[in-house]
Amino acid sequence: NPFDHWIIEDFLDIQDAKDVSKEFIDYESTEDIVRYKGWIGEKSTCNSWNRFPALTYKIFSNLLSLDFVSHLSAVTGVTPLYPDIGLHGGGWHMSGKGGSLAMHLDYSIHPKLNLQRKLNLILYLEEDYNPQWGGSLQLWSHDKEKGKPLNKIKEVEPLFNRAILFDTTQKSW
């Protein structure tokens, strides 16, 4: 257990998970999409509230609600805990065919609020995921002396409707 994390199966109601997975825009779309291509890999993201269809909008609203954030705080012990209503680093994240992301650290200070980003929630919504594609999230221990990842401790397969919640620090590889 290299850092605090929680794996949650069946995160959403199954029908909501199926329906929201169909709301994603096409990977090649250019409307309200930010494309990342660099040393960590290639992906497309969208965090524009105006672009989200109804169910996606509702789910993000629920995830950012005081009730849900209070529940996360109680479960994780993180206090105070604030939602990121601007979805900086959040929203839809998509990889194309053959896509991958290299091991990296997420930024830990929010660019607008200057608050520490403390928790990260990833929800996998690829209903037809095939384990042969790879794509597992790897959790690594931290080498304190070198400030780099040390040993792979765990892999989390991106199974449909599985969420992983984890501590976002400069040691959470």
Q: What are the language-model segments listed below?
A:
Residues N1-T76:
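Non-heme Fe(II)/2-oxoglutarate
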Residues N50-S172:
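Catalytic core of non-heme Fe(II) oxygenases with the double-stranded beta-helix
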